[in-house]
Every structure is written in structure tokens, then in C-alpha cells.
Amino acid sequence: MYMVEKSGKLLCRIVLIMLLFVLCFCASCGHKEARYALDMAEKRMWDEPDSALKVLESIVMPEDLEGKELADYALLLTQAQYRSNIVATSDSLINIAVGYYQDKDVEKRTASLLYKGGVLKDMGKDEEAMLVYKEAESYIPRIKDNRIVTLIYMGLGYLNQKNRNYALSIDYFKKSVAVNIVPKQVLSWKVSSIMNLANISYYWGNRDDADLYYSQLLDMVPLVDSMLQTKIYYNYGIYKSKEKEWAEAEKYGLSCNSWGINIC
């Protein structure tokens, strides 16, 4: 009887040890799969943000992630959603990354601040967004990813333009255009910045500067996709209609009648 009882206890211990081993093995596999997904999403982020988002959404039980994996997940998911034009309603997710990278990785710390600024801007919290963007700007001399640098300058340009700080806005958009990066990745960003420079210059009454910027945009038309081409032509047509240069406006798809103007 004693031997049977002892054998039963031994068997229970063996089963328990095996269960613990299986659980540890599964946890290890889950960790490796999550890390693989995070690395894949990071590689696809700039060229295929929609694809990166799907990879991140495939991670099973992301709430169980910890430490660096959780911080990377928070940063990458915020980045993928932001670059896929999905508006966030809270900054709680990106705050995980901001807190974790505060004294660790300056590149990811800066990226976290960039996207926190973007989230706050989308939430209409312009003052908070400005402070976060300015903090991100302070790290620019210490980072190497010029894509992040460009987006920080653009974010500050948009916020200052929105708040009618036009001199600062022009300065930041000029800085964003001047950043040396791979053209194919950021051509749309340059178009956006130059278009804002053209519009602000015109609003300020600097017609020569506006002409120069619009000329740069027209030179870029062969290099961009059809959507950006349409955007450039449309904005140039508006500019020419404001100048009452109707022939030019019509050439780029706008007529005076489309603006409710009776004088042609």
C-alpha cells in the first residue's frame, strides 16, 4: 500500500514537471513568434504600412507581451495605424513605448515621441502635441534615421501653420524638404511640404516665392503617381484662378465657372 501511494505521488510529480515543461516550451515558442512578427512588421513599415499592420494584428495575446517586446509592439502598432490613416482616440498605447525607451534607445525614443505628437495632433490637443514634437526635435542631432527627422519637421510645420505661426511653419517645411533621404520613400512628403510652402507664401503675398515653389511641384510631376499628379495640378489650378489667369487655370482642370466666378 505504501509503495503504491509512493508511486502515485511520483507519477503526479512527473506529470506536473511535464506540464511545466510544456507550458515553458509554449511560452518560449509564443515569445519567438511574437519577436519574429515584430521584426517583420518593422521591416515592412515604411513601404507597406498596411501589411505591417496585418502582421501586428496576427500576434496572439499581445497583452501578455512584456518589456522590450511590449514597447516595440506599442510603437509599431501606433506607427502602422498612423501611417494607415487610422485615427487614434487615446495616447495610452504609445505612452508605453515613450516610457520604456526614455533612457534606452534614442532612435526609438524619438520615434515614440514623433508618433505621440501625431496622435495628440489628431486628437485636437495641439498644445500638448507641440510640446511633444519639440521634445522629439531636441533628439534630432542624436539620431540617424532621416525619415523620422523629416516627419518631425513636417509635424511642427503643420502645427505652426494651423496656429498661424507662418514664419515658423515656413522654416520647418523648408527643413523637411532639405533633409537628405531616399527620394522614392519620401517624395510624397516633399510634395506636401513644398505645397504648404507655396500656399503660405501666397497667403503672405510673396508671389515670387509661391511661383518658385509651384514650379518645383510641376517639375516633380513626372516622378510621382497619378494621385499626387492630380493633387499638384489641382492646387496649381486654384493658385492660377486666384491670380485670375483663367487660361492657365483651365489648362490644369479648373474653370472660372467652377468657382462661381462670372468674370472670365
Put a short name on every predicted segment.
Residues Y2-L16:
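Bacterial N-terminal signal peptides that target proteins for export
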Residues V15-C26:
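Bacterial N-terminal signal peptides
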